[in-house]
Swiss-Prot record:
Its main location: host cell. The E7 terminal domain is an intrinsically disordered domain, whose flexibility and conformational transitions confer target adaptability to the oncoprotein. It allows adaptation to a variety of protein targets and exposes the PEST degradation sequence that regulates its turnover in the cell. This is Protein E7. Homodimer. Homooligomer. Interacts with host RB1; this interaction induces dissociation of RB1-E2F1 complex thereby disrupting RB1 activity. Interacts with host EP300; this interaction represses EP300 transcriptional activity. Interacts with protein E2; this interaction inhibits E7 oncogenic activity. Interacts with host TMEM173/STING; this interaction impairs the ability of TMEM173/STING to sense cytosolic DNA and promote the production of type I interferon (IFN-alpha and IFN-beta). It comes from Human papillomavirus 51.
Length: 101
């Protein structure tokens, strides 16, 4: 395009149809036992997570300067919810800079 006003003859569109994409899955398992193992592992995963401690990173603002304070904790999901409720309530975090002052 040259000039201040674009003209229709300056606009060139090249439309080409996309080639067809084969969406068929050709994956094959050796036996149905492998499928059963995968299903069993997927079913057991939430059960293990319920009682097992997991690492979490908590980010919250400093109550004095509003900078981000990061905590790394290891707990179960239920205990983490208690910490969340405490942080939403009256418990506040203080960054290291504000804690020294």
């Amino acid at each position: 395009m040259r000039g201040n006003v674009p003209q229709l003859k300056d606009v060139v569109l090249h439309l080409t149809p996309q080639t067809e994409i084969d969406l068929q899955c050709y994956e094959q398992f050796d036996s149905s036992e492998e499928e059963d193992e995968v299903d069993n592992m997927r079913d057991q995963l939430p059960e293990r997570r319920a009682g097992q401690a997991t690492c979490y990173r908590i980010e919250a603002p400093c109550c004095r300067c509003s900078s981000v304070v990061q905590l790394a904790v290891e707990s179960s999901g239920d205990t983490l919810r208690v910490v969340q409720q405490m942080l939403m309530g009256e418990l506040s975090l203080v960054c290291p800079c504000c804690a020294n002052n």
